[in-house]
Amino acid sequence: MFLDQITIELRAGKGGNGVVAWRKEKYLPKGGPYGGNGGVGGSIIIESATHVYSFESYRNIRFLKAEDGRPGATNNRSGKNGKDLVLIVPEGTLLRDVETKEILYDFAKSGERLVVCRGGKGGKGNTFFKTSTNRAPTKATPGKPGEIRQVELELKLIADIGLVGFPNAGKSTLFNTLARTEVKVGAYPFTTLQPVLGLVPCQEKLYQKPWIIADIPGIIEGAHQNRGLGLDFLRHIERTRLLLFVIDICGCERSSPEEDLRILMDELVHYREDLADKNRIIALNKIDDLLPDERQERLESFQKLFPSETFVLVSGLTGEGVDLLNSLFTNKLAV
């Protein structure tokens, strides 16, 4: 499954120690101090990128450490600085300090960088302590420790595709078929109690990155007034690039499938008017319950009532129509 939250301890590198050394040359019996400073410890940097879409590369990692600085050397040579450790995370990553609960940064766009833990400063060699009154210092200092911080990385629900529908519309079954995974499915409302992310392979070979798909918990009429699971999940919808409305083509006792679609659209507009302009596809699901002629009749009814919408007949249970749906994702998103 999609890994969208991790806690990890980050340890910057320790600074290298300064050294005590003396200049030793044939004609300089009292050449004086010649010990170099230690190198700076490596820092830990977090950077966001578009080619990363989960925290999978950090799975089961409890801590990460940057390289220590090297000690100073003779001939007044400074030690080599430790290499910085750069963690690449997806766009939409929220960085939080575990101890203080403070949000350190919101990586909203690709290419953003933040130094999370700074490496320790290098110690001073005895050359540093030479003065007019102390010509032969024997003092050197150790390197400083690097910063240590335990952080939580959370991927905000920034998905390419968001599945929207009433409870029991078959969203989770369709999600499982698209993402080739297994989300809990049941014949009762709100099987999905929190958003679930998955990956849908893109059929366009030139587009290497899979689509991130989100199964949003079922919306009910009045969700914009915080009924049901309410506003928390409507907020997730605004962060998606494409909405996939999932409609039970057979309808339910309460209303017709056409009325279900109208209510869903109204809920989104009541929550935020600009959601009406978001790219969308309407999946008429559970066609396995209908004969071919009945499917076509229902499709024509929808097309007549909603002439500007894109419809596709699918069955999350049998997989019928899923390839066509995937090609529509490519047409809508691979731009």
Curated annotation (Swiss-Prot):
Domain OBG-type G: 159-334
UniProt-annotated binding residues for GTP: 165-172, 190-194, 215-218, 285-288, 315-317
Similarity comment text for this entry: Belongs to the TRAFAC class OBG-HflX-like GTPase superfamily. OBG GTPase family.
Any one biological process term the GO annotation gives: ribosome biogenesis
Protein name (database record): GTPase Obg
Coiled coil: none
HAMAP family, per database record: GTPase_Obg
S-S pairs: none
Organism expressing this protein natively: Chlamydia abortus (strain DSM 27085 / S26/3)
PANTHER family on file: DEVELOPMENTALLY REGULATED GTP-BINDING PROTEIN-RELATED, MITOCHONDRIAL RIBOSOME-ASSOCIATED GTPASE 2
EC number(s) recorded for this UniProt protein: 3.6.5.-
Requisite cofactors: Mg(2+)
Gene3D superfamilies reported in the protein's UniProt record: GTP1/OBG domain, P-loop containing nucleotide triphosphate hydrolases
CDD domains, per database record: Obg
